């Protein structure tokens, strides 16, 4: 079960949270979904070099909050903060029905423990024709040096190093318990566009277990 299902969706409500928080009337539900998809695609393209790991959206009837978790906040905010205002205005133009747009930028304290950022580094190296084993080995070493990381697994699929027959290879170091629901497992899948075709990259990072806090009641209560 844990080997097949999506690691993040499997843990929603336990160690993972929804990346969108809103409720829409029945008539607006479809249009809001399309607007969110367009907004996320725009942010993915606009902030491709800003080290964005996650985007949280909170929406009400006439207001939307965009929380961007990034390893390079300066690339978004700019020196004087003007970049953040330009980004907010661009989002406002794409959402004309929303009266107020609020953008928050949150700096990631431990970027090497984020699967999205590790996967992006591997994809960039593969597109620069670096041998996939070297790229994967460097990514594993980089992640295992990050505080809190207890294990990592990386799988690369496709025409590796230009081979005629596509195959899959994976590397794992440490523990990556996919069946344990309380395990804090971060996951991402991305692609690398090479001259030989598209390579698929999957990254699992295990950051320890999150155990619920039990309240001990005093005698007589």
UniProtKB/Swiss-Prot annotation:
GO terms for molecular function: rRNA binding; structural constituent of ribosome. One of its GO terms (cellular component) is chloroplast. CDD domains: KH-II_30S_S3 (cd02412). Its main location: plastid. Residues 39-109 form the KH type-2 domain. PROSITE patterns: KH_TYPE_2, RIBOSOMAL_S3. Keywords: Chloroplast, Plastid, Ribonucleoprotein, Ribosomal protein, RNA-binding, rRNA-binding. It is found in: Plastid, Chloroplast. SUPFAM superfamilies: Prokaryotic type KH domain (KH-domain type II), Ribosomal protein S3 C-terminal domain. Pfam families: KH_2, Ribosomal_S3_C. GO terms for biological process: translation. Part of the 30S ribosomal subunit. PANTHER family: 30S/40S RIBOSOMAL PROTEIN S3, SMALL RIBOSOMAL SUBUNIT PROTEIN US3C. Belongs to the universal ribosomal protein uS3 family. This is Small ribosomal subunit protein uS3c. It comes from Nephroselmis olivacea (Green alga). The gene is rps3.
């Amino acid at each position: 079960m844990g080997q097949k299902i999506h690691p993040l969706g499997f843990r929603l409500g336990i160690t993972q949270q929804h990346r969108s928080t809103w409720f829409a009337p029945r008539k607006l539900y479809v249009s809001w979904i399309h607007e969110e998809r367009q907004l996320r695609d725009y942010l993915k393209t606009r902030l491709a070099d800003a080290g964005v790991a996650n985007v949280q959206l909170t929406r009400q009837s006439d207001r939307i909050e965009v929380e961007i978790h990034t390893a390079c906040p300066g690339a978004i905010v700019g020196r004087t903060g003007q970049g953040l205002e330009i980004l907010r205005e661009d989002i406002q133009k794409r959402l004309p029905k929303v009266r107020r747009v609020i953008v928050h930028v949150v700096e990631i304290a431990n970027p090497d423990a984020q699967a999205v950022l590790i996967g992006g580094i591997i994809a960039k190296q593969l597109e620069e024709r670096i041998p996939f084993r070297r790229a994967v080995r460097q990514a594993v070493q980089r992640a295992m040096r990050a505080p809190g990381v207890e294990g990592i697994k990386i799988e690369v699929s496709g025409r590796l190093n230009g081979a005629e027959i596509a195959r899959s290879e994976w590397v794992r170091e440490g523990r990556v318990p996919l069946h344990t629901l309380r395990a804090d497992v971060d996951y991402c899948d991305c692609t690398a566009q090479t001259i030989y075709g598209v390579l698929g990259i999957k990254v699992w990072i295990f950051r320890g277990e999150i155990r619920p806090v039990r309240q001990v009641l005093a005698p007589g209560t």
